[in-house]
């Protein structure tokens, strides 16, 4: 495991552009501040002003009032929106909140605004952007020598070789609950002593159903997750277990563990977030109630822990934690993701982009639930075996994504004109 991206035994020191001095709070840039990860990160910052200060925020641009409120409360220097047409509304919202004589933050707008912020002087960049558009900011933060608290799994998945080429040991701190758990459990032994990683899955709302029973699932049913509160795309990904497939690819890249040494088990209570089995037969697990503030706080504060980031397990109450093997026939997304990850190159980008389009088609009534992964598999098969290695470029990733999105839309539209279980 010499090629790991995430090193819990190593501490990365940010580049000289870090403005923090002795005794000063750690400076942060939060990308995706109005989303689920971003809002919870801000909650942690506001409760720990002696530990953290936010210098810049970015968001897509659909919630300018909330972004302006965050900027005012945190007194940031810069605010960015990806949508240039949202800039006037953001400036107006900022003007409403700042009093006479108060200096307003600088406003950046456009598709490259978050990337510019990611390279700005700070200690840690939290990438909480959703989707592969987070790749460019991820690369910018790493190249600028920032610590990267990575919640944007897609940037690592679609651009794995690109990220590995620029990241330095200990520079990436994973924020996904499963990878944060693995990161913590890996401190219990040497990398050569690791036998396998065990990634847990809640099983989503349809655990125990057969493939035939899943065919008639509606969007409303799929959006009702039993454990986590998430956005619609991530919630559907959890229901199909595509999210777990993406996490397996992410674990492979972060910890340099082969796919045949990564196992997925279903754990409905979501208290054990992942485990590491060592060569002596012992298994170390990280346990906490399902609350994303815990891994977010660890990502912001590593190697220190933030006191009272979230409630711990209540050991005074009787409770049962269950574990079940994964039903790969009903949920083929995990083995498909392992296949895609083994192909490497642009295949993960094709997998991710096609899935996003198929989820959109399902939510709009154009695909059956089981058609999401079936269609993604068809797109991956058509893509074939991609070019591998360090020659991968951002342009290659974007081109593959564009093709995959178009092809997925074509196949989804064809499926909508045929019986629900028909496939191209």
Q: Where are the model-predicted features located?
A:
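Catalytic, metal-anchored helix/loop core of enzyme active sites in primary metabolism
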Residues: 1-424
């Amino acid at each position: 495991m010499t090629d790991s991206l995430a090193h819990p035994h190593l501490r990365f020191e940010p580049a000289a552009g870090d403005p923090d001095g002795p005794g000063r709070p750690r400076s942060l840039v939060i990308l995706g501040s109005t989303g689920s990860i971003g809002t919870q990160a801000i909650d942690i910052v506001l409760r720990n002003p002696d530990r953290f200060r936010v210098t810049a925020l970015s968001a897509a641009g659909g919630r300018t009032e909330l972004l302006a409120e965050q900027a005012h409360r945190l007194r940031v220097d810069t605010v960015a929106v990806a949508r240039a047409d949202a800039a006037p509304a953001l400036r107006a919202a900022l003007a409403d909140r700042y009093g006479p004589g108060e200096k307003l933050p600088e406003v950046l707008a456009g598709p490259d605004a978050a990337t510019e912020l990611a390279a700005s002087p700070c200690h840690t960049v939290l990438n909480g952007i959703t989707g592969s558009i987070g790749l460019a900011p991820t690369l910018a933060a790493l190249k600028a020598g920032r610590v990267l608290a990575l919640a944007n799994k897609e940037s690592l998945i679609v651009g794995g070789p690109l990220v590995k080429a620029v990241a330095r040991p200990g520079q990436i701190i994973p924020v996904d609950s499963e990878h944060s758990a693995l990161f913590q459990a890996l401190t219990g032994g040497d990398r050569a002593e690791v036998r396998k990683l065990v990634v847990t899955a809640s099983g989503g709302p349809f655990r125990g159903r057969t493939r035939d029973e899943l065919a008639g699932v509606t969007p409303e049913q799929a959006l009702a997750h039993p454990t986590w509160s998430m956005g619609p795309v991530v919630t559907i990904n959890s229901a199909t277990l595509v999210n777990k497939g993406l996490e397996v690819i992410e674990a492979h890249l972060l910890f340099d563990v082969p796919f045949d040494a990564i196992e997925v088990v279903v754990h409905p209570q979501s208290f054990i977030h992942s485990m590491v089995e060592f060569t002596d037969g012992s298994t170390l697990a990280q346990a906490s109630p399902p609350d994303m503030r815990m891994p977010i706080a660890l990502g912001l504060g590593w190697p220190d822990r933030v006191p009272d980031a979230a409630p711990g397990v209540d050991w005074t109450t009787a409770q049962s934690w269950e574990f079940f093997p994964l039903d790969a026939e009903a949920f083929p997304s995990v083995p498909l993701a392992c296949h895609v990850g083994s192909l490497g190159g642009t295949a993960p980008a094709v997998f991710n982009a096609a899935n996003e389009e198929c989820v959109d088609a399902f939510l709009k009534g154009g695909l059956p639930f089981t058609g999401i992964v079936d269609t993604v598999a068809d797109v991956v098969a058509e893509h074939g075996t991609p070019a591998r290695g360090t020659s991968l470029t951002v342009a290659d990733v974007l081109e593959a994504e564009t093709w995959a999105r178009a092809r997925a839309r074509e196949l989804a539209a064809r499926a909508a004109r045929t019986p629900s279980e028909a496939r191209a």
